[in-house]
Amino acid sequence: MELTGVTSQSIFDDNAADLKLSWVAGLEGADRAFDVEFAREATSAADLVGHLNLIHPNRIQVLGKPEITYYQRLDDETRKRQMGELILLEPPFLVIADGMEPPPDLELRCTRSSTPLFTTPVSSAAVIDHLRLYLSRISAPRVTMHGVFLDILGMGVLIMGESGLGKSELGLELISRGHGLVADDAVDFVRLGPDFIEGRCPPLLQNLLEVRGLGLLDIKTIFGETAVRRKMKIKLVVQLVRRNDGEFERLPLDSQYLDVLGLPIHMVKIQVAAGRNLAVLVEAAVRNTILRLRGIDTLRDFMDRQRAAMQADAVSRGQGRLL
């Protein structure tokens, strides 16, 4: 996993409010980060944070009530040895959860070694879940793509095409028909799971749509709160192409896909020409995609019917010749 620039300070700043964190020791270790080799070999955020574990000392160590109780039962020599081994390998930081007070000797050792020590009243399980989700988000593969990203009938749809084809105008018409804007011009996509890519709008462009001749439109102000969305999962790409595009296939037999962060996203191509109602075509493409996701393929059904009709006709002709 890629965690460049992620430090104890940045994790604390991003999660202090949600987890009610207090920094009680090791302030000098604010720049401490994950071991580079350890982070590279981690397959998921579950490898980066967990309950106290001396076998995996390089991860974020969370100590709840059971761990503190266990620690307090140890004799002084065992405490010193085990914590010494843990601190020596420089975990990013330690978290004392469940509202427990940090043992004085552990707090002193963290201070001397510049190991950040946080406390929180939140349960240890909740802390681990929250930090795993946080680390998954900041380390996830991401890309910025050009287009208009919309919520159409509950489906995340990215409208793409070369400049001047009317992507923003089409987006504006779809918004006026009750659909929602996620982002215009630049869309930030993050792969958060094996089959889950989330799209968001960069903060600078939030709620804005640029239309030639009109300039920047604040969609939230013009159409209201329900006309914008914070994020959506991408499920469909609509590629606008010019009428004279020789590569356009009228009835594609095989589904078309666009690779986004290593995940194939279903794509349809729509020709742009005078008199064509693109908004209706996009809505129809979305409805058809919903049917495909449910296992209903209209083109395949038609081909099966055609094949059955041809076979029946061939049988009928053969029987006629026999007579």
From Swiss-Prot:
Its EC number is 2.7.11.-, 2.7.4.-. GO terms for biological process: regulation of carbohydrate metabolic process. It is an enzyme of class 2 (transferase). GO terms for molecular function: ATP binding; magnesium ion binding; phosphorelay sensor kinase activity; protein serine/threonine kinase activity; protein serine/threonine/tyrosine kinase activity. Its cofactor is Mg(2+). Mg(2+) binds at S168, E210. Disulfide bonds: none annotated. The keyword Cell membrane does not apply. InterPro entries: HPr(Ser)_kin/Pase, Hpr_kin/Pase_C, Hpr_kin/Pase_Hpr_N, P-loop_NTPase, Ser_kin/Pase_Hpr-like_N_sf. The keyword Glycosyltransferase does not apply. Residues 271-276 are annotated as: Important for the catalytic mechanism of dephosphorylation. SUPFAM superfamilies: HprK N-terminal domain-like (SSF75138), PEP carboxykinase-like (SSF53795). ATP binds at G161, E162, S163, G164, L165, G166, K167, S168. Both phosphorylation and phosphorolysis are carried out by the same active site and suggest a common mechanism for both reactions. Belongs to the HPrK/P family. Catalyzes the ATP- as well as the pyrophosphate-dependent phosphorylation of a specific serine residue in HPr, a phosphocarrier protein of the phosphoenolpyruvate-dependent sugar phosphotransferase system (PTS). HprK/P also catalyzes the pyrophosphate-producing, inorganic phosphate-dependent dephosphorylation (phosphorolysis) of seryl-phosphorylated HPr (P-Ser-HPr). HAMAP family: HPr_kinase. The Walker A ATP-binding motif also binds Pi and PPi. This is HPr kinase/phosphorylase. It comes from Cupriavidus taiwanensis (strain DSM 17343 / BCRC 17206 / CCUG 44338 / CIP 107171 / LMG 19424 / R1) (Ralstonia taiwanensis (strain LMG 19424)).
